[in-house]
Amino acid sequence: MNVYGTSQIRNVILLGHGGAGKTTVAEALAMITGVTKRMGKITDGNTISDYDKEEIKRQFSISTSLIPLEYEGENGPIKINLLDTPGYFDFVGEVEEAISVADAAIIVVNCKAGIEVGVEKAWEMCEKYNLPRLFFVTNMDDDHASYRELVLKLETRFGRKIAPFQLP
């Protein structure tokens, strides 16, 4: 890994309800950026971020994990410290600690489940820390999932500042 100055480092936190797909998104980003050559699976117990024995047994994140990603931006290389946080609020202390150092947030939303409590809490935390954020929608391939309905619900709940910039 290269050496980066502070102006080239970004801390990005993954937030959302438990089971929304934060760790899967982290795995995909790690693979796309070349951190790993394969995507781990939670059910197989071989993800980069959920490596603790208890996390593997329970099949969900208990602690925040840092995944260093390197990205070639328009102004040169940058390092993104991706913070994969627990979604279950028994572990909210982990989320509070991680969000306090974040520069931006990705709120992961399960399209079928819609706006769950974890999504609302994630938004509230981003408001509290004045963090720029975006929604990343997962599970759109389910027959009972509607991307358009979810976008309307997000606009209704969080205001007109919600705007899709990538359509499925």
Regions found by a protein language model. Give the residues of each.
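P-loop NTPase switch module centered on the Walker A-proximal segment
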Residues: 1-109, 115, 149, 158, ...
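Glycine-rich nucleotide/cofactor/substrate-binding loop typically near the N-terminus or early
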Residues: 168
